[in-house]
Swiss-Prot record:
This is Large ribosomal subunit protein uL10. Forms part of the ribosomal stalk, playing a central role in the interaction of the ribosome with GTP-bound translation factors. It comes from Rickettsia africae (strain ESF-5). One of its GO terms (cellular component) is large ribosomal subunit. Keywords: Ribonucleoprotein, Ribosomal protein, RNA-binding, rRNA-binding.
Length: 169
């Protein structure tokens, strides 16, 4: 890389750090081009990205953005995976790493909290934000549908429900 290209590369990494609250640092040594392309495609479908970085430039960018706590994670053949949705990204990376031994998860950062490999694997087991929203909506709708069902029942059924509830108390 030419000296004149380095500031541009650092600026690209700085933008990734600023725009992505979730970053996973990986070692990719031994992955084939087709494997990296496959990973990039699956990440792109989830609005995430994969970027091979020079360690020195990644460290400079980390220092410029106040992410000093991840500087020591940059050693060896490093790539960063970045996204705004940490759980989906973690699931994709962990599953890909299970299928491809040459991708090693080193650590990462989510909302300025440094994570080690184990924490990223645990993060991947959590439900995504959309899954949680679906569960909450389902929980909120369940009591309402039960009340509507009771109200639509014949009056004799309603009387039995009230009688059963009164006998409980």
């Amino acid at each position: 890389m030419l000296r004149s290209e380095k500031p541009v590369a650092v600026e690209d990494i700085v933008n990734i750090y600023k725009e992505s609250p979730s970053i996973i640092i990986t070692h990719y040594h031994g992955l084939t081009v087709s494997q990296v392309s496959s990973l990039r495609e699956s990440l792109k479908s989830k609005e995430a990205g994969f970027k091979v970085v020079k360690n020195t430039l990644a460290k400079i960018a980390a220092n410029q953005t106040g992410l000093n706590s991840i500087v020591n994670l940059f050693a060896g053949p490093t790539a960063i995976v970045y996204s705004k949705e940490p759980v989906e990204m973690a699931k994709l990376v962990v599953n890909f790493a299970k299928a491809n031994d040459n991708l090693k998860i080193i650590g990462g950062i989510v909302d300025n909290h440094v994570l080690d490999e184990h924490s990223i694997k645990e993060l991947s087991k959590l439900p995504t934000l959309n899954e949680l929203r679906g569960k909450i909506v389902g929980l909120l709708q369940a009591p309402a549908t039960k009340v509507v069902g009771v109200l639509q029942a014949p009056s004799s059924s309603m009387a039995r429900v009230i009688q059963a509830h009164a006998s409980k108390n």
